[in-house]
Regions:
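Charged, glycine-rich active-site and insertion segments that engage polyanionic ligands
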Residues: 1-42, 46-49, 53-60, 169-172, ...
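Clamp-loader machinery-focused feature within the broader ASCE/P-loop NTPase space
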Residues: 1-155
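Short hydrophobic/aromatic-rich motifs at helix boundaries and adjacent loops
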Residues: 101-103, 131-134, 155, 175-178, ...
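Conserved adenine-binding aromatic site and its adjacent loop/helix in ATP-hydrolyzing domains
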Residues: 131, 162, 189
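Conserved catalytic/switch belt of AAA+ P-loop NTPases
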Residues: 134, 158-169
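Residues immediately C-terminal
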Residues: 152, 166, 182
């Protein structure tokens, strides 16, 4: 990976930043890169190009168990009367990372049975981080803070500003983020940012085959649809067991027939799901719509999807819906995801979404 080699070069030139922000969209490998850097930092036999992968430092870092590695991530209160703190979930986080190094925040929160609760990195946790990093190193070397998803800091992140700007000696901070726009500008300005691009379809296909998740044409098909996200590729593999397509078809039947009762039912049923489940469903709808947009310029049969979904996409790509309407539908759904992420009332948002999609499909202007 080019980003990793560049960072290792900075290490050997003694210009490695004390506060590094690795940013990349879901599934491009931001956390695996951060973990590889942590392992390199603690490696006892590092070379110019990589960690040895065999020493005690490497093995403990890979398991997130090194005494001088301090972890911070979104969490929830473990029981009433307590506050969300990462230290309550360290073992669960280690297990999660071992199982799902490309895992999402939603998957992590489900792993700790958060249900509909949204994770947080609290002011109390920020103060604990400051206290911890001001202690001496347990093993006499570097101390490393690895914070996954600093977007969940909110305004509480300002508590860390002095620490980020003037860290204790031999202290490094590595932040792993997806959405730079959700991070406080005061934190962004104090870190050096490395942005990761999408993974190539060829790399995703090889990874799926190596893990025996898909082979041959199916691996290539999934890699093409995943659009550079290994997380999306894994989601597509799992969709055979958790098929959302019937729900999508039901929604669009309601939209095309202007069935207000069915749209209200859709909003009511999905409002009972967790916010992350709602977002996953809407992202899936966007994925199908984007495939339909591409299909406008591709020959018949070239859409890389299972048969039922491919037929649905081809119908959308035909004369059923205009190109402009498809684009507007994607933008409308993206807006709904934005508001759901910010705790808007989900049933209201989903009902409004259904109505807006009806207006878009049938070529009407929504009244002001």
């Amino acid at each position: 990976m080019q980003a990793k080699s560049g960072l290792l070069k900075m290490w050997h030139n003694n210009v490695f930043p004390h506060a590094l922000l690795i940013a990349g969209s879901e599934g491009v490998g931001s956390f695996p890169l951060a973990l590889a850097l942590v392992q390199y930092i603690f490696c006892e036999n590092k070379t110019e190009f990589d960690s040895c992968g065999k020493c005690n430092g490497c093995s403990r870092a890979a398991r997130l168990e090194h005494a001088d590695l301090h972890l911070s991530f979104p969490s929830i209160a473990p029981k009433p009367g307590t506050k969300p703190m990462s230290r309550y979930y360290i073992q669960e986080f280690r297990e999660f990372v071992q199982q799902s190094p490309y895992g999402t925040t939603y998957e992590w929160l489900q792993h700790i049975n958060a249900e509909n609760k949204q994770g947080n990195i609290t002011a109390d946790e920020c103060r604990e981080i400051i206290d911890t990093l001001n202690l001496k190193s347990y093993e006499g070397g570097k101390k490393v803070l690895l914070m996954w998803r600093p977007e969940y800091l909110g305004k509480e992140g300002n508590i860390l500003l002095k620490l980020i700007e003037e860290p204790p000696k031999d202290t490094l901070m590595i932040f792993v983020a997806e959405n730079l726009e959700d991070i406080l500008p005061t934190i962004l300005s104090r870190t050096q940012t490395v942005k990761l691009g999408p993974i190539s379809a060829a790399e995703i296909a090889v990874a799926l085959e190596l893990r025996s998740l898909a082979d041959g044409n199916r691996a290539a098909q999934i890699a093409h649809i995943a659009q550079g996200s290994f997380t999306e590729a894994l989601r597509l593999v799992r969709q055979a067991d958790n098929d959302l397509f019937p729900e999508v078809r039901q929604l669009f039947n309601a939209i095309f027939t202007n069935n207000g009762v069915a749209i209200a039912k859709f909003a009511e049923e999905w409002s009972k799901a967790g916010r992350e489940q709602q977002k996953n469903f809407l992202h899936y709808v966007i994925q199908l719509l984007e495939q339909a947009i591409r299909a406008r310029y591709m020959p018949q049969g070239s859409v890389a999807l299972p048969e039922a979904e491919a037929q649905f996409v081809q119908r959308l790509a035909g004369n059923k819906v205009s190109f402009e309407a498809l684009q507007k539908m994607v933008a409308t759904i993206a807006d709904t995801i934005f508001y759901i992420e910010r705790n808007a009332h989900s049933r209201t948002q989903l009902h409004a979404l259904g109505i807006r999609l009806v207006y878009t499909v049938h070529g009407h202007t929504i009244p002001a």
